[in-house]
From Swiss-Prot:
<dbReference type="Pfam" id="PF00227">
    <property type="entry name" value="Proteasome"/>
</dbReference>
<comment type="function">
    <text>The proteasome is a multicatalytic proteinase complex which is characterized by its ability to cleave peptides with Arg, Phe, Tyr, Leu, and Glu adjacent to the leaving group at neutral or slightly basic pH. The proteasome has an ATP-dependent proteolytic activity.</text>
</comment>
<dbReference type="GO" id="GO:0005634">
    <property type="term" value="C:nucleus"/>
</dbReference>
<keyword id="KW-0539">Nucleus</keyword>
<dbReference type="GO" id="GO:0043161">
    <property type="term" value="P:proteasome-mediated ubiquitin-dependent protein catabolic process"/>
</dbReference>
<dbReference type="GO" id="GO:0010499">
    <property type="term" value="P:proteasomal ubiquitin-independent protein catabolic process"/>
</dbReference>
<protein>
    <recommendedName>
        <fullName>Probable proteasome subunit alpha type-2</fullName>
    </recommendedName>
</protein>
<dbReference type="InterPro" id="IPR000426">
    <property type="entry name" value="Proteasome_asu_N"/>
</dbReference>
<dbReference type="InterPro" id="IPR023332">
    <property type="entry name" value="Proteasome_alpha-type"/>
</dbReference>
<comment type="similarity">
    <text>Belongs to the peptidase T1A family.</text>
</comment>
<dbReference type="GO" id="GO:0019773">
    <property type="term" value="C:proteasome core complex, alpha-subunit complex"/>
</dbReference>
<dbReference type="InterPro" id="IPR050115">
    <property type="entry name" value="Proteasome_alpha"/>
</dbReference>
<dbReference type="GO" id="GO:0034515">
    <property type="term" value="C:proteasome storage granule"/>
</dbReference>
<dbReference type="InterPro" id="IPR001353">
    <property type="entry name" value="Proteasome_sua/b"/>
</dbReference>
<comment type="subunit">
    <text>The 26S proteasome consists of a 20S proteasome core and two 19S regulatory subunits. The 20S proteasome core is composed of 28 subunits that are arranged in four stacked rings, resulting in a barrel-shaped structure. The two end rings are each formed by seven alpha subunits, and the two central rings are each formed by seven beta subunits. The catalytic chamber with the active sites is on the inside of the barrel.</text>
</comment>
<dbReference type="InterPro" id="IPR029055">
    <property type="entry name" value="Ntn_hydrolases_N"/>
</dbReference>
<keyword id="KW-0963">Cytoplasm</keyword>
């Protein structure tokens, strides 16, 4: 029955579903596992960097993106769709919100804008839903925030969650290991242990990518002598830092 409605991008099936969104979720479920964990003093985003060829340069592969100095994003699904949404999020943050208010948008505002773009693709003719799910991590006045955005445009705040091929296994593991009052360092270790449960093959600094939202990194500010200036909270761990964490597992 669903096949009768799959030709239309915006027609509901009798069961109340938009079939194209189901197909978009299938694309997400075929992507590599990505996860996010919120701690008391930060957030961890982690994912597998899977190359289609051993000849590919691992340094050119990146799935975690900087949006603003305090917000980062990771995805599972179709890479080209993700890059479009990253460009949109950066444009809204830098040339839209900051130009008007002289500050970067709070995480929730940015999430709402990205979710609106994704939702519009489910009701407009001549387009298709974005084949990605996103995990967006940021630091606001209220502390660290972690959101998941799906192809339908729905978004939810999470303490810890996972998306991608082995999301169910990862979530089951996170439910067992996550505790209230978790520190950022412990969250990084749990993230690596979770990926270890879902990844087939070797884990090292070239096959794992980790981004953290934590205390201001003033050494990354690049500006000296500005009173009250704070460094960015979001940064990606270097391959060597990831290797050090893996050694201590």
């Amino acid at each position: 029955m669903a096949d009768r409605y799959s030709f239309s991008l915006t027609t509901f099936s009798p069961s109340g579903k938009l079939v194209q969104i189901e197909y978009a979720l299938n694309a997400v479920n075929q992507g590599v596992t990505a996860l996010g964990i919120k701690a008391t003093n930060g957030i961890v985003l982690a994912t597998e960097k899977k190359s289609s060829s051993p000849l590919a340069d691992p340094s050119s592969l990146s799935k975690i993106s900087l949006i603003t100095p305090n917000i980062g994003m990771v995805y599972s699904g179709m890479g080209p769709d993700y890059r479009v949404l990253v460009d949109r999020a950066r444009k809204v943050s830098h040339t839209g919100y900051k130009r008007i208010y002289n500050e970067y948008p709070p995480t929730r505002i940015l999430v709402q804008d990205v979710a609106r773009v994704m939702q519009e693709a489910t009701q407009s003719g001549g387009v298709r839903p974005y084949g990605v799910s996103l995990l967006i991590a940021g630091w606001d006045e209220g502390g660290p925030m972690l959101y998941q955005v799906d192809p339908s445009g729905s978004y939810f705040p999470w303490k810890a969650t996972a998306i991608g091929k082995n999301a169910t296994t990862a979530k089951t593991f996170l439910e067992k290991r996550y505790t209230e009052g978790l520190e950022l360092e412990d969250a990084v270790h749990i993230a690596l242990l979770t990926l270890k449960e879902t990844i087939e093959g070797e884990m090292n600094g070239d096959t794992i990518e980790i981004g953290i939202v934590g205390p201001p990194a003033d050494h990354l500010l690049g500006v000296e002598g500005v009173e009250g200036a704070k460094g960015p909270r979001f940064r990606k761990l270097s391959p060597q830092e990831i290797e050090d964490y893996l050694t201590n597992l």
